[in-house]
């Protein structure tokens, strides 16, 4: 399909923009039938070979907190202004998760929670929860700005959950039920504060609020509070560039406290994407283009740790993964001198993109956390759905027209203020959404359709005027619309989102078979106005002052062409040639050492030998294996005869954008080619955001 030039105000080199658009043209598949979208798999981190890929979820799951109860793991996270809130996910292997409940269905604390009286809670609502289990009861504590600390509790994580409020607000808190029966919460940023909660969790113990860890020790925000083998640990993240994760440790709450960095500079090869300048909420927006420099790498931050029954420890954290939102990753934890470092023994502080699954004692089927598609035939919405703010439950229905979601329009000046917009997290790295809309029940002034909720946002909608129907695409970046005439109010609407390029394209169809693009490419940007990633949304509102008609949606299908971290099979038993992505140099064996040589045609054919769990050895034609000696310094990557061991074994790491890394089991670091032709090393800590640091390779099959 011919792509139109993107229309938006942008500052930055034009070459980068052209590259981004060219990548989209190459990457974009065009699905032309609705039937092709049914039954497609959704993102799952499990690679099916004993390994997993980060992120665990390729959709927004921010401020995660995790607990283990027996052999079961539970996870919750921030939901801000969306309802229901505080999702509860369950797993038995830390990789395959499934949503089982929300802690609450609605949180209505005033007109701003309902998008009434010109007020909203975008970027607010409920956030940064602390998940705990104590004496048979599950607890979730979470702050709401201006409304204090919310406490939810249940005997069963599937609910029902009860709720009470503590008037004082404790932002970014973490709760510890201590061995002496006291209940403590740490909170705040920089200077970490601690306060004791009363026994029934209805208030704070007077006189107990104080600074626990002074700002001078360099702690951050988003604390996670633990007591492990008699010692107290607090894990936090430093806000700003590179956001390292810090850990404070003490033998007693009174101190003294020590602090070390346990995770730093791990971006998983992801750099900063599009960003709106300032906090403008009206067009035209000024959008800065991607900046893949190391100084703006998007590092893992804000998370905690959990122990498995086998004694392994694992870390969880989030990453500002551009417009798709803040994503959760899983990290092996290595204890050194009583400190829980994220990463492997030879590469402390750095999380592998692909690694072997945790030893939890359970082998689970490959599972996605949500059923994203919905045919609206059931008595309830799929659990993936969340309303934008508190809905008016009298203005939507699954029963008025069985098999359809019916949205009755309410007055709103624009989509931002439209009540009863039904949303779900957009999913990466790439997805297409299709819905069938019957707009015969719309009234003049109604507009109903499919949107990308973000700031700026965009939508494709059917409009009812005094003289009939039209279809319109609105791009808030520019504030411009593109219109087309339609002969029927029965349409199929689609949006394709590529979160690698951060470009979306809307299209529509009169028959559900052939789709026509409408409008230019829409730039999806990461922003802090909503403090969430992009969300798909179904909506219906009236541009007048009174309620209008109704819109009926027949289905909502999500298609993900790249639902696995291993984007293509490892070429086991095939010979490949490797080329450095940075400069096009080939890898070749010269004088018994692996070297980078100019000219792709000079590369050595290396046979990929399966070593299990996604690990491989690289065999030369004469039966020798690429081997890492010593610390993997330049010149220590050679070829050796004999049966391959750890020195000859590499984790095959697919970075999901066509490039591959090789993680040495001997050094826990990556093979890296020098900038100029020369000997190769295996001492690189991890990929740079621009993928041009010599650790990223492309491979092709070659004759043996």
Please report, for each region that a protein language model flagged, where it lies by residue.
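Bacterial N-terminal signal peptides
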Residues: 19-29
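N-terminal secretory signal peptides that target proteins for export/translocation
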Residues: 1-15
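Sec/Tat signal peptide C-region and signal peptidase I cleavage site
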Residues: 31-34
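Lectin-like carbohydrate-binding module/patch detector with strong preference for beta-trefoil
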Residues: 567-704
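Residues marking helix boundaries in flexible regions
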Residues: 26-27, 57, 571, 577
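Carbohydrate-active catalytic/glycan-binding domains of CAZyme proteins
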Residues: 3, 36-570, 605, 647-651
């Amino acid at each position: 399909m011919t792509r139109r030039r993107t229309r938006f105000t942008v500052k930055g080199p034009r070459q980068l923009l052209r590259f981004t658009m060219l990548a989209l043209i190459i990457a974009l598949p065009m699905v032309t039938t609705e039937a092709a979208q049914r039954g497609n798999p959704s993102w799952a981190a499990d690679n099916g070979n004993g390994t997993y890929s980060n992120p665990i979820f390729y959709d927004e799951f921010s401020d995660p907190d995790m607990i283990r109860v027996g052999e079961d793991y539970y996870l919750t996270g921030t939901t801000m202004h969306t309802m229901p809130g505080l999702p509860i996910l369950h797993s038995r292997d830390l990789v395959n998760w499934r949503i089982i409940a929300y802690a609450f269905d609605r949180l209505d604390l005033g007109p701003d929670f309902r998008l009434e009286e010109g007020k909203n809670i975008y970027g607010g609502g409920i956030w940064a929860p602390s998940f705990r289990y104590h004496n048979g009861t599950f607890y979730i504590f979470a702050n709401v700005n201006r409304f204090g600390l919310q406490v939810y509790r249940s005997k069963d994580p599937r609910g029902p959950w009860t709720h009470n409020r503590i008037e004082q607000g404790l932002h970014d808190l973490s709760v510890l039920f201590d061995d002496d029966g006291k209940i403590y919460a740490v909170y705040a940023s920089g200077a970490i504060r601690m306060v004791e909660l009363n026994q029934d969790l209805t208030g704070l113990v007077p006189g107990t609020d104080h600074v626990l860890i002074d700002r001078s020790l360099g702690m951050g925000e988003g604390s996670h509070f633990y007591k492990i083998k008699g010692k107290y640990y607090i894990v936090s993240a430093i806000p700003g560039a590179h956001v390292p994760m810090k850990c404070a440790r003490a033998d007693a709450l009174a101190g003294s406290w020590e602090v070390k960095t346990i995770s730093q500079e791990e971006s998983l090869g992801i750099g900063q994407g599009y960003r709106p300048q300032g906090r403008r909420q009206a067009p035209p927006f000024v959008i800065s283009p991607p900046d893949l420099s190391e100084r703006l790498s998007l590092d893992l931050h804000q998370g905690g740790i959990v122990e498995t029954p086998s004694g392994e420890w694992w870390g969880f954290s989030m990453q500002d993964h551009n417009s798709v939102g803040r994503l959760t990753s899983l990290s092996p934890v290595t204890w050194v001198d009583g400190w829980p470092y994220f990463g492997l023994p030879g590469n402390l502080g750095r999380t592998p993109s692909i690694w072997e699954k945790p030893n939890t004692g359970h082998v689970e089927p490959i599972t996605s956390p949500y059923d994203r598609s919905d045919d609206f035939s059931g008595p309830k919405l799929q659990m993936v759905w969340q309303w934008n703010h508190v809905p008016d439950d009298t203005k939507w229905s699954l029963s008025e027209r069985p098999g359809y979601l019916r949205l009755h329009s309410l007055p709103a000046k624009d989509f931002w203020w439209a009540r009863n917009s039904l949303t779900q997290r957009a999913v990466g790295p790439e997805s297409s959404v299709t819905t069938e809309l019957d707009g015969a029940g719309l009234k003049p002034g109604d507009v109903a359709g499919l949107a990308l909720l973000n700031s700026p946002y965009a939508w494709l909608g059917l409009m009812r005027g005094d003289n009939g129907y039209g279809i319109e695409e609105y791009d808030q970046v520019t504030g411009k619309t593109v219109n087309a005439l339609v002969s029927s109010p029965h349409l199929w609407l689609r949006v394709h989102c590529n979160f690698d390029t951060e470009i979306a394209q809307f299209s529509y169809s009169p028959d559900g078979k052939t789709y026509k693009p409408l409008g230019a490419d829409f730039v999806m940007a990461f922003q802090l106005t909503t403090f969430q990633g992009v969300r798909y949304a179904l909506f219906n509102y009236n541009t007048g002052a009174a309620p209008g008609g109704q819109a009926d949606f027949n289905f909502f299908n999500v298609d993900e062409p790249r639902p696995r971290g291993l984007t293509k099979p490892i070429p086991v038993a095939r010979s490949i040639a490797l080329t450095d992505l940075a400069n096009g140099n080939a890898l070749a064996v010269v004088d018994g050492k692996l070297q980078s040589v100019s000219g792709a045609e000079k590369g050595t054919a290396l046979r990929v030998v399966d070593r299990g769990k996604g690990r491989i050895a690289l065999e030369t034609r004469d039966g020798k294996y690429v081997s890492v000696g010593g610390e993997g310094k330049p010149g220590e990557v050679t070829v050796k005869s004999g049966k391959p061991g750890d020195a000859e074994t590499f984790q095959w790491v697919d970075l999901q954008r066509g490039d591959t890394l090789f993680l040495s089991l001997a050094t826990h670091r990556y093979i890296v080619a020098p900038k100029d032709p020369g000997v190769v090393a295996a001492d690189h800590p991890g990929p740079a955001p621009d993928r041009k640091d010599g650790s990223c390779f492309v491979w092709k099959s070659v004759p043996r």
